[in-house]
Swiss-Prot record:
Organism of provenance: Cerithidea rhizophorarum
Official protein name in the record: Globin
Subunit description: Homodimer.
Cellular component annotations (GO), alphabetically ordered: extracellular region; hemoglobin complex
Keyword rRNA-binding: no
Length: 151
């Protein structure tokens, strides 16, 4: 489970990352752009994006909708950090959704690798080590849960 300091860092950074719909849409597109640049083959899982450019991911209905959906899921996690049963249920739901798409736990590891750069970009040039560590702890929890579901 997440430590109190991590919960605090997640909650405070989330207020900036998900300030409003436009911020969410921009940050979602940024996150997936970084993922696709560092791990180009991950784009194969997102056929609904087609050959969309980074700019199009920020401006088209499909791109904006995906950002909103992903950030809604993350927001549910942030809102449930003090409810272990709910967190486990959300992680299970996330795992099942990704297993259906044949997205394994190693792909969650790729997202973990991209996330520090995303935080630097989305939080205006430098997320603290505490913030990066907190997000890594949350993503590690999701990755570990994903591995357990695949067994």
């Amino acid at each position: 489970s997440l430590q109190p300091a991590s919960k605090s860092a997640l909650a405070s950074s989330w207020k900036t990352l998900a300030k409003d719909a436009a911020t969410i849409q921009n940050n979602g597109a940024t996150l997936f752009s970084l993922l696709f640049k560092q791990f180009p083959d991950t784009r194969n899982y997102f056929t609904h994006f087609g050959n969309m450019s980074d700019a199009e991911m920020k401006t088209t209905g499909v791109g904006k909708a995906h950002s909103m959906a992903v950030f809604a899921g993350i927001g549910s996690m942030i809102d449930s950090m003090d409810d272990a049963d709910c967190m486990n249920g959300l992680a299970l739901k996330l795992s099942r959704n990704h297993i259906q798409r044949k997205i394994g736990a190693s792909r969650f590891g790729e997202m973990r690798q991209v996330f520090p750069n995303f935080l630097d970009e989305a939080l205006g040039g430098g997320a603290s080590g505490d913030v990066k560590g907190a997000w890594d702890a949350l993503l590690a929890y999701l990755q570990d849960n994903k591995q357990a579901q695949a067994l």
